[in-house]
Amino acid sequence: MPRYAIIDSDTASDDTIAILLASKFFKLLGITIVAGNVKFENEIKNALFTVEYFNLDVPVFIGSSRPIMGKWSTVEEVHGNNGIGDWKIEEPKISPEKEHAIDAIIRLSKEYEGELEILAVSPLTNLALAYLKDPTIVKRIKKVWIMGGAFSRGNTTPIAEFNFWVDPEAA
């Protein structure tokens, strides 16, 4: 039986690897983009480039371009200005979907009720906003896998991990 997933991503180099790995184990129903690692337009471009370059049949949905509250901080010093180590990539020929990521998450949770898994490798803004728009979503999602939090030391501050730090209200 196939496993169905959405990847919620702030597409930098680490997330492109996550997309490729996940595509081998899940039927990816979408990549939802959220503000995180680098400039938002670069995150969108990186997701589209990854899908196109590796010939993945996965729609890309644009989500929240800022945290729920507070100031958005990026980490170009970690991922390069474009999010993938300043590797020069071509402009993607494909475009993102017109449907907003939050609406896509809610819709897909209904279409794949009890089967949908969320692979959140980014700040949790899109997921929090989807929940605020439709609190019943939690009953329809099978699992949420989160790349976030810190057990002992953070990667952004001594105690905070980036994905939770950039939008703590969403986490």
From Swiss-Prot:
Pfam families: IU_nuc_hydro (PF01156). InterPro entries: I/U_nuclsd_hydro_CS, Inosine/uridine_hydrolase_dom, IUN_hydrolase, Ribo_hydro-like. GO terms for molecular function: hydrolase activity, hydrolyzing N-glycosyl compounds. The keyword Cytoplasm does not apply. SUPFAM superfamilies: Nucleoside hydrolase (SSF53590). Keywords: Glycosidase, Hydrolase. Belongs to the IUNH family. This is Uncharacterized protein in bps2 5'region. It comes from Acidianus ambivalens (Desulfurolobus ambivalens).
